Amino acid sequence: MTTTAARMDFETTLKGKYPAKRHAQRVADYIRNKMPGASGVLYLEGRATKLLEDNDEAEPFRQRRYFYYLTGCPLADCHYMYDLDADKSTLFIPPIDPDSVIWSGLPVSVDEAKQRWDVDDVKYTSDVNATLAHVGSSKPKGSSVFALANQVSDKVTFLEFDNKNFSILKEAIEVTRVVKDEYELAIMAKANEISSDGHKMVMQKVKHVQNERELEAVFLGHCIAKGARNQAYHSIVASGRAAATLHYVPNNADMAGKLNLLLDAGGEWDCYASDITRTFPINGKFTKESREIYDIVLKMQNECIAALKEGVLWDDVHLLAHKIAIDGLLQIGILQGDKDEILESRTSVAFFPHGLGHYLGMDTHDTGGNPNYADKDTMFRYLRVRGRLPAGSVITVEPGIYFCNFIIEPFLKDPKHSKYINADVLEKYWDVGGVRIEDNLVITKDGTYNLTTAPKDPEEMEKIIQQS
């Protein structure tokens, strides 16, 4: 069963605080489960202000995800400590710098920080070492400080702790991040709402522009206007045959004479990503060949979404997508021969070379997927999630079929594969470029609900474009 996030009252949820304390407790529980009797503190640092290497401008700031997960704090130059034994969290914020106030205004105060973020105490970063020393000296013998490797400032000392563990904290946060709580899902619903509307706006403009970069500007402008200033990743705005390049970067080609546009773009809300792809006809009407491919990909997505629920093996769903792709490509004549033999030969990888999807959260390719990029089976090598899906996880479902010369030509030259590909029929489809459809799904006990509301029905998209 699939429902849509439009029915989620996420705005009410977002009026509360980001549940940082509960995240810290979950991470602590994981560590204690791995290390019974663990005593000590978790210690993290947010991202520091950093200038570009050859001038006095600051680099664009993005908070460290591990730090944000335990604090909800987007400020630069902050530190954090969580006392495992006392269940007490402390956020350290930069003290007031009078010289900085002249240029940037007053920073967040201690009292404001206490009101804004879900932490038990707030101090200045000038108190970090003294606080660590005080807490460490009160701990029993064998206490530990748990921190992230290569993310501890030289000026910070852990002298009062007997042990320093730089491995398990990263593992603990990455595992606990897989299952989202209600607040995290509300953030992602917000990001999806803004981004879905942005995709629709691009559909409305696609007939009226000449270059891909103009459509990138439409999407970015909409996100910024709605408060989503950061993008989860570099947008892919690929027209014509460029859509066969999975992570197309330039976004600056003229679109005259091309059939379709593939838009893979997602805004970010409070450090959480959306990741949405739509493919639609530039002139408002799919060609016969484009519509055939689109219908195959839409069927791949719909049937894979219908197969999802808690405990489903993601590898099996990816395999299902390939089976549907093979059936569709056989029906239109691009593939020929026995479908089971085609599946066994992995010839369908020529047209669907990537994994079906990935976990989504603070990172676009979020933690916990356990991929195996050394897999000798080419069908599964780029599958970013391996294993069973837990309820509360968010995963993208993004099947695609692509006509990329660089990928397909070696298959045409290999007798093992070429016997299953009708090159004469294939010739009619190169200009389709590539079709991908991507939604963001929350896994539930009995099914899913879809955070993504961007139009994907082919007739609806054609109507939006034609009436714009």
Swiss-Prot record:
Q: Name one GO biological process term.
A: proteolysis
What is the free-text note on the cofactor? Binds 2 manganese ions per subunit.
What functional role does this protein have? Catalyzes the removal of a penultimate prolyl residue from the N-termini of peptides.
Cofactor(s) listed: Mn(2+)
In terms of SMART domains, this protein maps to:
AMP_N
Record Pfam families: AMP_N, Peptidase_M24
| Entry binding sites for Mn(2+) 1 | D275, E398, E438
- Tell me its EC number(s), please: 3.4.11.9
Originating organism = Neurospora crassa (strain ATCC 24698 / 74-OR23-1A / CBS 708.71 / DSM 1257 / FGSC 987)
Q: Which domain of life does the protein's organism represent? A: Eukaryota
Hydrolase is among the record's keywords: yes
- Disulfide connectivity for this sequence is none
| Family (UniProt) | Belongs to the peptidase M24B family.
Q: Where are the transmembrane segments?
A: none
Protein residues bound to Mn(2+) 2: D264, D275, E438
| Catalyses which reaction(s) | Release of any N-terminal amino acid, including proline, that is linked to proline, even from a dipeptide or tripeptide
What GO molecular functions are on record for this protein?
manganese ion binding; metalloaminopeptidase activity; peptidase activity
| Keywords, in A-Z order | Aminopeptidase, Hydrolase, Manganese, Metal-binding, Metalloprotease, Protease
Identify the InterPro entries for this entry.
Aminopep_P_N, Creatin/AminoP/Spt16_N, Creatinase/aminopeptidase-like, Pept_M24, X-Pro_dipept-like
| This protein's name | Probable Xaa-Pro aminopeptidase NCU11288
